[in-house]
């Protein structure tokens, strides 16, 4: 089995479809199908900030229920899940756009989409170990020693990265560069922190190329170790991208 991993779609449905087509998938009855033995893996943060979060939710949930794709959650997925379950969350940092889309639906459609996403989230693994352990897909990454573990500390790392507890002036959390110290044998494919180009450090690759911030949506082909990207239709926001340190794909 070969895999095509996509991360941080953030409601950019049109770019998601374009990238799938570029990767060789054809959508049949709402399900992505490849002529070769390949499977799509979504690495979290399906929604928020972009224009079509509900469409992304519907598409991934339906395909996942059919067993056609794999999915692991991101921090935005976690927050949306808690919001849909009625837990108290701050409707900000992008969630407000998804909430607004949901409110535009009829009550019946809103209930259906919410239930679809809740089922998706509750049935998904925290991270995915694939290809006989040679590949791990985790939204914000994972340390080599934590692969196979599922503690609260590991969950926080996988969803939010290696946060220090400090914040940047704009409110974003300060994160350590865990990839620079990674010495594991498995390839870790992750996103979460926008970079202008896919960032390869040791056996890790960050494929969040900031589609929702006007750059690109990127897929990583494994075991080929190739990246495929499509351009974003969103306005470009240079302030959202971290400095690149490491080899660019």
Curated annotation (Swiss-Prot):
Pfam families from the UniProt entry: Metallophos
UniProt GO molecular function: bis(5'-nucleosyl)-tetraphosphatase (asymmetrical) activity; GTP binding; nickel cation binding; phosphatase activity
Family according to the record: Belongs to the PrpE family.
GO CC terms: cytoplasm
Listed EC numbers: 3.6.1.17
Protein name, as recorded: Bis(5'-nucleosyl)-tetraphosphatase PrpE [asymmetrical]
Superkingdom in the source lineage: Bacteria
Entry keyword Heme: no
Gene3D superfamilies linked to this entry: 3.60.21.10
Keyword Nucleotide-binding among record annotations: yes
Keywords on record: GTP-binding, Hydrolase, Nickel, Nucleotide-binding
Function of the molecule: Asymmetrically hydrolyzes Ap4p to yield AMP and ATP.
Catalytic reaction(s) noted: P(1),P(4)-bis(5'-guanosyl) tetraphosphate + H2O = GMP + GTP + 2 H(+)
Swiss-Prot/TrEMBL cofactor(s): Ni(2+)
């Amino acid at each position: 089995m070969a895999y095509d991993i996509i991360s941080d779609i953030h409601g950019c449905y049109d770019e998601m479809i374009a990238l799938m087509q570029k990767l060789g998938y054809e959508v049949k009855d709402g399900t992505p199908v490849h002529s070769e033995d390949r499977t799509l893996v979504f690495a979290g943060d399906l929604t928020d900030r972009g224009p079509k979060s509900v469409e992304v939710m519907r598409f991934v949930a339906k395909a996942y229920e059919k067993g056609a794709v794999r999915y692991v959650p991101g921090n935005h997925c976690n927050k949306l899940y808690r919001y849909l379950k009625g837990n108290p969350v701050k409707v900000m940092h992008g969630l407000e756009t998804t909430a607004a889309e949901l409110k535009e639906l009829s009550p019946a459609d809103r209930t259906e989409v919410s239930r679809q996403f809740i089922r998706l989230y509750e049935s998904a693994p925290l991270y995915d170990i694939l290809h006989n352990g040679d590949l791990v897909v985790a939204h914000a990454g994972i340390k080599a020693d934590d692969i196979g573990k599922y503690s609260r500390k590991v969950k926080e790392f996988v969803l939010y990265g290696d946060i220090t507890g400090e914040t940047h002036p704009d409110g974003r959390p300060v994160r350590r560069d865990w990839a620079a110290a990674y010495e594991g044998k498995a390839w870790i494919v992750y996103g979460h922190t926008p970079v202008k180009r896919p960032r390869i450090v040791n056996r890790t690759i960050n494929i969040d190329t900031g589609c929702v911030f006007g750059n690109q949506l990127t897929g990583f082909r494994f075991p080929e170790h190739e990246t495929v990207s499509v351009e974003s239709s969103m306005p470009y926001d240079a302030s959202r991208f971290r400095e690149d340190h490491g080899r660019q794909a």
